[in-house]
Amino acid sequence: MMMDKQVEEVKKHYPIVEDWSVIVARKEDDCMTVTDAVPFILAGYKNVSYEMDDIVVLCSEPIGLTWEDVRFLKNHEGSVSFEEIGYEDKAMVYHVDLG
């Protein structure tokens, strides 16, 4: 039941918009675990585009992000719609709309 609630929360807060919705999740202490990613995968984010140290990028379609792209998305303000939302007190989740 808890997982169903998490999946619904993901669908509510992070709706997939065509191929362009990207989730960038970072944990404070260690890498994002598989269980952290499961609600996103069940909600439709089936591709882990990039993973390095404490960064995981989930998106609806493989779009070939590189580590530099991830850094750009995390640090860029302006044309990229960028929203930071806490998720379960374990990870900071960034919802990035590339449109």
Swiss-Prot record:
Lineage of the native species?
Viruses, Duplodnaviria, Heunggongvirae, Uroviricota, Caudoviricetes
What's the name of its gene?
45
State the superkingdom.
Viruses
Query: This chain belongs to which protein, by name?
Result: Putative gene 45 protein
